[in-house]
């Protein structure tokens, strides 16, 4: 990624320090509410068509073009680049779906890879 094209979502030194100390960074307004709503609609359509497959499916960015768009979104890539540098590979993607009223949770975690 060419650093001449970085947007305002490129992480600040303070955000980088927070990430290195805590293993996460939030909030990070990367995609905006319109794209988030569009993506939710697409996830719901996919879930209605294929049942609970999205909860089990891995590497969604390989077979869903709209998921690949999220993975390749410049704001997301710029934030990741500021932490690990420009050599970025999406190893996996997955939906963690928890509908309202469902028991259970998806815990916070820090990847070790």
Pin down the residues of each PLM region.
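Non-heme Fe(II)-dependent double-stranded beta-helix
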Residues: 1-113
């Amino acid at each position: 990624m060419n650093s001449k094209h970085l947007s305002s979502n490129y992480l600040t030194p303070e955000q980088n320090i927070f990430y290195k100390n805590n293993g996460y960074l939030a909030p990070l307004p990367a995609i905006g509410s319109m794209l988030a709503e569009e993506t939710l609609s697409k996830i719901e359509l996919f879930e209605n068509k294929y049942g609970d497959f999205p909860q089990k499916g891995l590497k969604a960015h390989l077979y869903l073009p709209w998921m690949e768009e999220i993975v390749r979104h410049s704001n997301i890539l710029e934030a990741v680049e500021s932490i690990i540098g420009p050599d970025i590979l999406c190893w996996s993607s997955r939906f963690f779906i928890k509908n309202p009223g469902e028991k259970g949770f998806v815990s916070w975690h820090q990847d070790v890879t």
